[in-house]
Amino acid sequence: YDNEIERIEGEFENGDILRVEDFDGYPLGCGFINTRSKITVRMMTRKKDTVVDDAFIEMRVRDAWEYRKTTVDTSSCRLIFGEADFLPGIVIDKFSDVLVVESLALGIDCLKPVILDKLKKVLAEDGISIRGVYERSDAKVRLQEGMERVKGFIGEPFDTKVEIVENGVRYMVDVQDGQK
């Protein structure tokens, strides 16, 4: 949080990934910064020498999917759950063959294309094809992060009414106008 930061050294832009240290200079890991946010730094890793690159993002996405495969028996689930999956500020739900993404932090918003690309790749390795992605990043908190509210297709448009199966029961979900 902003009140826990003593100083920020070096040049950066909001959304950049920085090394984080405690008051004695001991490395705490890496996180992305946004001085406009009350949560000034969102930690991506507690490992001090980690490089947050495409391979790192793929590892985080793969770990999240591997965990979901052991706990979920449905055509739909929350694939990425922000901080719980060490990808703070982003939630990605799978409704059958459609992904719905909500990005609430500037730093993760910058990584959103890579996260979605790696997620599609990891799912494809298990024979899961994604026909479309819809963004529901329209929460007011985005304004506090210095971002616009966004709602719409990422890529080609598709029918936003999706049939899912949960516990043997079929449901119709409207990813565009339904509950996020």
Q: Where are the regions that the model predicts?
A:
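Short, surface-exposed beta-strand-loop junctions and turns on beta-sheet-rich folds
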Residues: 37, 107-108, 179-180
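Non-catalytic accessory regions of SAM-dependent methyltransferases
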Residues: 1-96, 159-161
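Non-catalytic substrate-recognition/targeting regions of SAM-dependent transferases
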Residues: 83-87, 91-93, 113-180
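Short clusters of small/polar residues that mark proteolytic maturation junctions
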Residues: 22, 32, 104, 175-176
